[in-house]
From Swiss-Prot:
GO cellular component: cytoplasm; ribonucleoprotein complex; ribosome
Entry annotated with the keyword Ribonucleoprotein: yes
Family annotation (Pfam families): Ribosomal_L36
Keywords, comma-separated and alphabetical: Ribonucleoprotein, Ribosomal protein
Native source organism of the sequence: Hamiltonella defensa subsp. Acyrthosiphon pisum (strain 5AT)
One biological process term in Gene Ontology: translation
Domain of life: Bacteria
GO molecular function: structural constituent of ribosome
Gene that produces this protein: rpmJ
Family membership: Belongs to the bacterial ribosomal protein bL36 family.
Record protein name field: Large ribosomal subunit protein bL36
Record carries keyword Secreted: no
Amino acid sequence: MKVRASVKKMCRNCKIIKRHGVVRIICSDEPKHKQRQG
């Protein structure tokens, strides 16, 4: 999981999700694309 100031979709399978006020990106295709804003 990457922690970044600005999170962006890295491929078309990435999904933006907001959990408890934290923006996250999850990807079913490429687990390396997981990100969290912080």
